């Protein structure tokens, strides 16, 4: 028993690293970065005003081959309700993930015990590689109300990105997240305004969405989808350094 008291338990991730997967951009997005940049693309954030996933986002998800899977954390309850689900996709559609704390708890479980986390997604066959994780939509997350509101939620986003980075290192999966553009928050009855009061010291918004700049700066590429004359157009907000 004395021997057991001195035994230390270490996470498996301390000893195992996975081969990294990279995001394959669909044709309509490939003109935004060079081939060399695309070959290093692990973190992508998409800003678009549609509730439903755009065609480009669906193409990004529908890129699995063989024994690969993509985990879709369906905060908006859109993906899992589609009549034709994405091939090779696993869906996490739980009330526990509609607040940022619950989302972080689930992702930490995915890091510490992937099989236990995936069982919550009704997965019973684990003979596959997790190619990527999609989180749609960060703008719908509920946040804690407190006198230190801004500090709390900013720190939660920093924690969110930290666990996403750890998952990429451990599982090799790429990360795609989505949010609404800034002007969308002033939409119907201003329903999304109050909870998005994270202040910036400079008073200047660096990105056309109301996520913390510290989170956005962690992305390899940020794409902004606009509709001009009835047609979708994509432009790059940030990309990998040359």
Curated annotation (Swiss-Prot):
Its main location: nucleus. CDD domains: Psy3. It comes from the Eukaryota. One of its GO terms (biological process) is recombinational repair. Transmembrane segments: none annotated. Keywords: DNA damage, DNA repair, Nucleus. It is found in: Nucleus. Present with 876 molecules/cell in log phase SD medium. Disulfide bonds: none annotated. Required for resistance to the DNA-damaging agents methyl methanesulfonate (MMS), cisplatin and oxaliplatin, but not to mitomycin C. Plays a role in protection against mutation accumulation. May be a component of the recombination-repair pathway. This is Platinum sensitivity protein 3. One of its GO terms (cellular component) is site of double-strand break. The lineage of its organism: Eukaryota, Fungi, Dikarya, Ascomycota, Saccharomycotina. InterPro entries: P-loop_NTPase (IPR027417), Psy3 (IPR031779). Component of the SHU complex composed of at least CSM2, PSY3, SHU1 and SHU2.
């Amino acid at each position: 028993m004395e021997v057991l008291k001195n035994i230390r338990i270490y996470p498996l991730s301390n000893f195992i690293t996975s081969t990294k997967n990279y995001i394959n951009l669909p044709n309509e997005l490939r003109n935004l970065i060079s081939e060399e940049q695309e070959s290093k693309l692990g973190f992508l954030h998409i800003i678009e005003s549609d509730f439903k996933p755009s065609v480009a986002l669906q193409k990004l998800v529908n890129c699995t081959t063989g024994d690969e899977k993509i985990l879709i954390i369906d905060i908006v309850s859109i993906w899992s309700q589609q009549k034709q689900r994405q091939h090779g996709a696993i869906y996490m559609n739980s009330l526990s993930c509609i607040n940022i704390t619950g989302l972080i708890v689930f992702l930490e479980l995915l890091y510490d015990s992937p099989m236990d986390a995936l069982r919550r997604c009704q997965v019973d066959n684990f003979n596959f590689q997790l190619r990527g994780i999609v989180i749609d939509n960060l703008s719908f997350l509920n946040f804690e109300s407190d006198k230190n509101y801004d500090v709390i939620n900013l720190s939660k986003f920093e924690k969110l990105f930290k666990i996403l980075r750890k998952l990429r290192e451990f599982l090799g999966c790429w990360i795609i997240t989505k949010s609404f553009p800034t002007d969308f928050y002033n939409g119907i009855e201003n329903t999304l305004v109050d909870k998005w009061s994270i202040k910036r010291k400079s008073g200047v918004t660096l990105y056309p969405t109301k996520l913390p700049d510290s989170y956005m700066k962690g992305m390899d590429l940020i794409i902004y989808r606009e509709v001009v004359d009835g047609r979708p157009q994509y432009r790059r907000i940030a990309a990998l350094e040359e």
